Amino acid sequence: MSVAFTSLGMFSRRTNWDRQPNRLTELLEARRAAGQPVFDLTISNPTELGIDYPERELLAALSNPQALRYRPEPRGLLSAREVICRYYREKELCVDPSNVFLTAGTSESYSLIFKLLCNAGEGVLVPRPSYPLFDYLAQVNDVKLRHYHLRCYDSEWRLDIDRESAEGAKAVVIVNPHNPTGAFLKRPEHQEIVGVAKENGPALIVDEVFLDYPLAQDDRRFGSTAGDAEALTFTLNGLSKLAGLPQMKLGWIVVSGPPPLAAEAMARLEILCDTYLSVNSPVQVALPPLMKTGGRVRSQILQRVKSNYETLRKATLNSPCSVLNVEGGWYAVLRAPQTKSDEEWAIRLLEKAGIYVYPGYFFDFDEHKYLVVSLLPNEQAFASSVQSLVAIVEQNCQTE
């Protein structure tokens, strides 16, 4: 191959990522290559964690002969969209099937909405801390990210959005409950955000993939934004978390808002979806039984998350490493002693005991004192790893 074809100038700037592994990743790869044990407290794939999936029912759902027919519907098959509307009816929300757009997962949902709303270089407001995926999605869609903050007061996270920060943004992204802090959107926060949208004009993109994983009841929570008519709103969800089926690659967008805005958004979004037609027929045909069995899978996952959170909470009592309040989702945030940075603590845990956790900077925390762990691992392995984690932190604090 000639030099011209191997030149970096061949490729777009949007894909010019820093692909060098960080120190933690290098240590993790070296440990695995050497055959040393790794106790992964970041794992979030429920299909590999001993969850009891109803295999016979799931496989039967995927063997429907109707899946052999191809019907290119930009919004997705009506039968599948009606199932999604029933899901919202169970939450006492009225959603019309015409307002539902099927996608090949939440990442594609974001990409479609960014394309719908943003010209190149325009901004979208996202939370900080937040999931690292936003950076990649913004870059490949030529969107600039701006940030509002989640701030922690008395172990509870609260949104801090003001009109000045939202000015000029084409959309505000809300993750409800937030990942990784687990903070649910509260009613006063929702009203504040709607007020910002009405005054400054940004659309609302509300990611609800963890909505059905509350760890406790709280009457302050707003619930789902599906069907909200006060501001142009795109509500996202999908099978990956809702049914514990990430391999099925089915997500959806519910469009709502003032009728003229919502109608224009849906007309344009339909053409975008028609351009890709990315959702496969078998999963659309199988959606009714997948949603039904998904409820049983979700119950198991929620039970495990609650159990592991309680284990973590008890293990960190009277410890220099404390766990912040978790309201929902699959993750927990630990506040580590400031004798080391978050990355230094993560490296220490991996070197000493093979325990792999996320340093908070992976999620763009403002302060480098947080560690993030998944609440999905097997309960016994999780409890053992957490005990070792706490012991290492305590021992380190005593010697420094």
Question: In which residue ranges do the predicted regions lie?
Answer:
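Hydrophobic residues in well-ordered beta-strands that form the structural core
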Residues: 126, 147, 206, 357-359
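Conserved core segment of the aminotransferase class I/II
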Residues: 227-306, 314, 392-394
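Conserved glycine-rich beta-strand-loop-beta hairpin in the small C-terminal domain of fold type I
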Residues: 288, 303-313, 323-336, 367
